[in-house]
Structure formats: C-alpha cells, structure tokens
Amino acid sequence: MEETDDGEDFARESTAERIIRLTGEISEETSEQFILNLNRVAKIQGEIIVIVSSDGGDIEEGLRIIDALQLAKNKGCPIYTVVSGKAYSMCAYIACIGDKRTIYPHSRLMFHASRFEGADDGRTLTAVELQKMHDELAVYDGVFRELLANVGLDHATIERMLASDTYVNAEEAISLGLMNSIETEII
C-alpha cells in the first residue's frame, strides 16, 4: 500500500477519489490495510477504482480481499480494476473480480494453480499432513477455477492456464475476456 508522511491525508484523498491501490506482496498487513481503505470508500455507494500491481502473495489474504470486494459490490459499489504493470498469481485473480476490468498496454497477468511453499525446516511430513495440504490446495484451485469461469473462460482454457505459469499480455487478456479494455489514460 502507498504511504505518505500524513497517512490521514492520503486516506482522505483516496476516499474522495474512490481509488484504492494494491501493490507489493499480498500479506496479512496488506490485506488489512486494503480492506480498511475499501471500507472507508464503500460507505458511500458508487464506483470504486482498484489499481493493482503485485507479484501476488498469500492465498488466504488474497481471498479475504476478494471477499471484501464482493461485499462492496453487493452494497452497490461497482468495482473497476486496473492492472498497472503486473498482476501475478493471487493478484491476477483479484484483478478479475472487477465489474469493469482494464489493463495498461504493457502490463501482464500471470495465472497458475495454488502451490505449497514450506517444509524448508528439514522435517519430514507425514502422509496425513501431505493429504491435508493437498486438500487445501484443491479447495483453492476450485476457487480459482470459479473466478476464471466467472469472466467467461471455458473449462479447457482454465485447465491450460492452471497447468503451469501462464503469462498473458494486454492483448491476450482482452481476447480471452479476462480484461474488458486496454487503459489509455493515467488513473
């Protein structure tokens, strides 16, 4: 999240402009700050612009952001997502939640299935632990498939995109229906 010397002025300015930025790694801290800003802006009905630029991050925190955006939409606040630079991994799924979705000409999205990163401490995992992780990843992948289906992708395309890291440039994002338009103005 962007910070200024006077965080209160920034929050007031963001609320007035109805713009929220999601930048950097998606973490507990990032999602808390994003949801706090979203709640401030969503107090008054109207379109909310969400500018994203991130390598992704924590799946659960990203899903919290998606849930919060969906709740804002349900309260009468259409969401307009703008990809600026990159929306990789979890951030790509967040970018796809918008009612209107745009991307700058040289920006990219990257999709993949959920991954487990851990157990670097040298310990051996039991079959039960591995099964639990597998089950959790399957749930996340189901959510990712649902999010991609909601923008109109067919099953075969979704499976191809989740099979490995799939990078999509602005033109491809439009042709796939992931984004509605290429942004031509500075927001």
Mark where each language-model region is.
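Terminal-region recognition feature
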Residues: M1-I187
